[in-house]
Amino acid sequence: NKKIQLRYHPLNTTVLTDEKWLVFVLEQILSNALKYTKSGSIHIYLSPDAPKTLVIEDTGIGIAPEDLPRIFEKGYTGCNGRADKRSTGIGLYLCRQIMEKLSHTIRIESEMGVGTKVYLGLDTVSL
């Protein structure tokens, strides 16, 4: 059993994108956050510093610094203590490919034992 608090701040924003593919990317990112967060929180919000950026932040195990440069490579699974987790190394690769095709961006910051932040740079129109 996991004890995770999901915090979502409703966004008063319209995203100019292909909904199907953006949902796929969000599902992949949230799946990883849930997989690698034993307890704590997952927080989804628009960045106050970059209002066109959606942030998915978790308090999971984090990603080792040596793995960060390669996490978007096809088939790369990393080795930061996740041997018990099943991974094909295809999810983040697909996320980057999709985001680039949609003219969006994706980047990740992470610290071992603290958690991970995924930044999705989106074209937006404020309502």
Language-model regions: role of each:
Residues 10, 14-17:
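Conserved micro-motifs of the catalytic ATP-binding
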Residues 33-34:
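Short helix-loop "hinge" at the ATP-lid/N-box region of the Bergerat-fold HATPase_c
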Residues 41-51:
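Short beta-strand/loop element within the Bergerat-fold HATPase_c
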Residues 58:
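Acidic ATP/Mg2+-coordinating residue in the GHKL
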Residues 63-76:
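Short conserved segment of the HATPase_c
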Residues 91, 95:
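Short alpha-helical Gxxx[C/S/T] motif in the catalytic ATP-binding
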Residues 103-104:
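Conserved glycine-rich
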